[in-house]
C-alpha cells in the first residue's frame, strides 16, 4: 500500500515515514502542498494510476496553501472514495471540530496521537 504524507515538520515527517515503512507501507514524503499536488498530476492531467492509496495531510502548513486548501483541491480532482485522506494536526479541539463539520467523511487525528491509531485507520482504508 502506498501512502502520500504531507508534513512540514522534519522531525515528525522522519518519524512518521520510518514508522509507516516499518509497518510495511511505501511512503512518499512531502513538505509542501504544491509538492503533494504535483505528485498527483502528470502535466495537467490526473496521474493514472494514482501514486497513492491513502494520503495523510497536516493542516498547519506554511506557505500559500495550508492543508485544508490542499484537501479541498484534491477533492476537486479525485473522489474521496478513490483517494482517502487522513488529517493530522496540532490545531485546537475547537478548530478540529470545525474541520470535521466541513469534511465529515475525513478522519482527523489530533497531535500527538499514537502511531497505532493511525495504522488502524490506514488498515480500514485499504483498497479491497
Where do the protein language model's features map onto the residues?
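C-terminal output helix
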Residues: 113-122
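Two-component/phosphorelay signaling modules centered on CheY-like receiver
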Residues: 10-34
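His-Asp phosphorelay/catalytic-motif detector in bacterial-type signaling
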Residues: 50-53, 78-84
Amino acid at each position: 500500500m502506498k501512502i502520500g504524507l504531507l508534513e512540514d515538520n522534519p522531525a515528525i515527517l522522519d518519524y512518521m515515514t520510518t514508522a509507516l515503512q516499518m509497518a510495511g507501507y511505501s511512503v512518499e514524503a512531502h513538505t509542501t502542498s504544491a509538492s503533494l499536488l504535483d505528485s498527483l498530476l502528470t502535466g495537467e492531467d490526473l496521474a493514472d494510476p494514482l501514486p497513492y492509496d491513502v494520503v495523510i495531510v497536516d493542516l498547519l502548513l506554511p506557505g500559500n496553501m495550508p492543508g485544508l486548501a490542499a484537501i479541498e483541491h484534491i477533492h476537486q480532482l479525485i473522489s474521496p472514495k478513490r483517494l482517502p485522506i487522513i488529517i493530522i494536526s496540532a490545531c485546537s479541539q475547537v478548530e478540529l471540530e470545525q474541520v470535521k463539520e466541513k469534511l465529515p467523511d475525513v478522519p482527523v487525528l489530533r497531535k500527538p496521537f499514537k502511531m497505532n491509531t493511525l495504522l488502524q485507520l490506514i488498515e480500514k482504508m485499504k483498497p479491497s
